[in-house]
Amino acid sequence: MTAGGVMYSDYALGGFLDAASREPWFDNTVFVITADHCASSAGKTEIPLEKYHIPAMIYAPAFVTPGSVGKTASQIDLMPTLFSLLGMDYDSWFYGRDILADDFRERAFVATYQDLGYLEGDRFTVLSPVDRAEQFLLRPTDDDPYALERTEAIDSTHLNRAISLYQTSSQWNKR
């Protein structure tokens, strides 16, 4: 997205929230605002991490104290986090986790139409068709915060975690 696109989105969102704030239902409303990966990453076979770094915002002035979180997470973590912010006690069927919990493990799930990626810490595993797997180390630079370096050896613990997370989510979805 261009700078102009970001500025317009910011303007439009601000106008929407300003108009909503004058409505009688505003104090009883939670706004969850997020994005999807950018259009230029759709259909690609490689997984460009920088195109999957997206914003998310939970806005509910009557319920949620303003703050900022700089953790690596995924969209699946939004609802568990929201329920936690609202103080809701519930039995979780969510695959995501509350990103504000002390035991939250920072990780991200990213995918293209063929490849599945799993980022945890500085290790990025890419699962591809026909039992192919690659691993990379995240090596940020001043010019590229998402620079990846292919590893020679596969970390089997990280590989097995990536496989098990995607397999269990697939099986769970078939129930």
Predicted regions and their residues:
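Solvent-exposed soluble domains appended to multi-pass membrane proteins
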Residues: 1-175
